[in-house]
Amino acid sequence: MSAVLQTISQAVHSVPAGFPAAANESSHEQVSLDSYLVSNPASTVLFRVRGESMTGAGIYDGDLLVVDRSIEPVHGQVVVATINNDMTVKRLYKRAGEVKLQAANPQFQDITFVESDEMSVWGVVTFSLRRWN
């Protein structure tokens, strides 16, 4: 990741998403976005999302995914996978000998495999970043 992210101020207190609370502007600490977003820099890659198949998981077209290749993928995780040399982002389903890639949007079908298909999990999605403005 870029050294541009270095550190920024983070409020020590949380901000309620319900009823407003009194603000305390003097309590801030420094946080490194690099260390917050990336636990293993040598195995972390950023991908830009293209498409709408994962909106139910909060991943939208244009989002930036932080993907860690050093994490062993398990059932239920959102992963970047290759299928016959094509990449996709889906939720990994791995139960009772069945493996498939699940979309998180009912308008898209899950991806199942036949013997001739080559599928591998490329990495595990650890963050999805979206620009609001």
Predicted regions and their residues:
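Short, hydrophobic/aromatic-rich segments at coil-to-beta transitions
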Residues: 42-44, 74-79
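Structural motif
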Residues: 62-63, 77
